[in-house]
């Protein structure tokens, strides 16, 4: 059975700080390629969104991921924050579309369940598990850890989907 190495970019969008994490995945093994944060300037929102889109597109062109994964929008009590997060998410989706990447979306609960084993895990628990799972020298910043967790969730989820498809093929 052929298990090609896939490169996945995970994106944790935010209007001020957008985290990114790029991993490789082959079979049940994963490793870290790059991670970081896009910290936007204190410009007006349209310039911050453009910066997010431009920097993500540059990262995609440099690292050439095969797939992208992003966190689904969740409900906010603050509607202004929700709107800004949705706009930052839109900028990230435009960057992936410009580079012809397919995008998978996962809820925060799914991501935490996949990485920590508990859907209500704290940010610190996610950060710690990402550090351990990817054998990083030190724990990444919270936004980058979340992005790496999103990429890990996608690697796990897509691997499971492939196995289910293979099993289904042998049953018919």
From Swiss-Prot:
It catalyses: Endonucleolytic cleavage at a junction such as a reciprocal single-stranded crossover between two homologous DNA duplexes (Holliday junction). InterPro entries: RNaseH-like_sf, RNaseH_sf, X-over_junc_endoDNase_Mg_BS, X-over_junc_endoDNase_RuvC. It comes from the Bacteria. Keywords: Cytoplasm, DNA damage, DNA recombination, DNA repair, DNA-binding, Endonuclease, Hydrolase, Magnesium, Metal-binding, Nuclease. Mg(2+) 2 binds at residue 71. The keyword DNA-binding applies. One of its GO terms (molecular function) is magnesium ion binding. Homodimer which binds Holliday junction (HJ) DNA. The HJ becomes 2-fold symmetrical on binding to RuvC with unstacked arms; it has a different conformation from HJ DNA in complex with RuvA. In the full resolvosome a probable DNA-RuvA(4)-RuvB(12)-RuvC(2) complex forms which resolves the HJ. Belongs to the RuvC family. This is Crossover junction endodeoxyribonuclease RuvC. It comes from Coxiella burnetii (strain RSA 493 / Nine Mile phase I). The gene is ruvC.
